[in-house]
Amino acid sequence: MSASSQKTALTAEDIRAMKGRTPIVSLTAYTTPMAQLMDEHCDFVLVGDSVGMVLHGLPSTLGVTMEMMILHGAAVARGLKRAMMVIDMPFGSYEQSPAQAFANAARLMAETGAAAVKLEGGEEMADTIRFLVKRGIPVMAHIGLTPQSINTLGGYKVQGRDDAAKPLIADARAVAEAGAFAVVLEKVPASLADQVTEIVDIPTIGIGASAGCDGQVLVVDDMLGFFGAFKPKFVKRYAELGPAAEEAIADYASEVRARRFPSAEHTFADHAPQKAPQQD
């Protein structure tokens, strides 16, 4: 199954059914035009809280608000027809209690059209995941490196090495048993990601994990090369659009200052051009 073979939007059950089959494809999106480009190629599109860093210049995801997620989620939804849309729950919107999580998840889905929410955390979030799923909200879990916990993790470090492997496996089991339809594994050793993929009965979505995961996700601006200095080890650059865009902007500025733009082909005459007479 792939997004391009579906005539209607994929659902959480469709994604779950892809476990162990054709790898699941996902990217982040924050705008309508980018979502339109992805729709034919991605199985699900993630409206990530990475939007705070990518589009708003924040130093981390911690400053992202519900309002920001709703704004960008609604924009992405307008660009999708086939791919499923999953939206991140921002920091502080779900950790306090399952009831808080339900209220905010329901709002995100109602105001954006998202088909599921994603939240970070393992065993400690299992009760919340179970609470949401029982009330009709599909949940994608996220374990390993969880960016919203960056202050307690001590940086963007690889998670699950050595003695930390068992707790991560326990996290994966807990979120699967709680009813999550998929789980993101971020920045964990490849062998551990493969082990988790074998253990749990839901799809694993890798980002800095392993090709053996059931699917992959990347931040689209990273893989398109918009940020020159920022290049994590797990990101493959499929294009270098940042330098190309800067070159185009520099050319435009040069032509404006030299009065070469706009040229005659980009301006309008005093009178509309005459239509050629029709031939009998």
From Swiss-Prot:
InterPro entries: Pantoate_hydroxy_MeTrfase, Pyrv/PenolPyrv_kinase-like_dom, Pyrv_kinase-like_dom_sf. Mg(2+) binds at residues 49, 88, 120. GO terms for biological process: pantothenate biosynthetic process. Signal peptide: none annotated. The keyword Protease does not apply. Transmembrane segments: none annotated. GO terms for cellular component: cytoplasm. Its main location: cytoplasm. It comes from the Bacteria. It catalyses: 3-methyl-2-oxobutanoate + (6R)-5,10-methylene-5,6,7,8-tetrahydrofolate + H2O = 2-dehydropantoate + (6S)-5,6,7,8-tetrahydrofolate. Its cofactor is Mg(2+). Binds 1 Mg(2+) ion per subunit. Catalyzes the reversible reaction in which hydroxymethyl group from 5,10-methylenetetrahydrofolate is transferred onto alpha-ketoisovalerate to form ketopantoate. Belongs to the PanB family. This is 3-methyl-2-oxobutanoate hydroxymethyltransferase. The gene is panB.
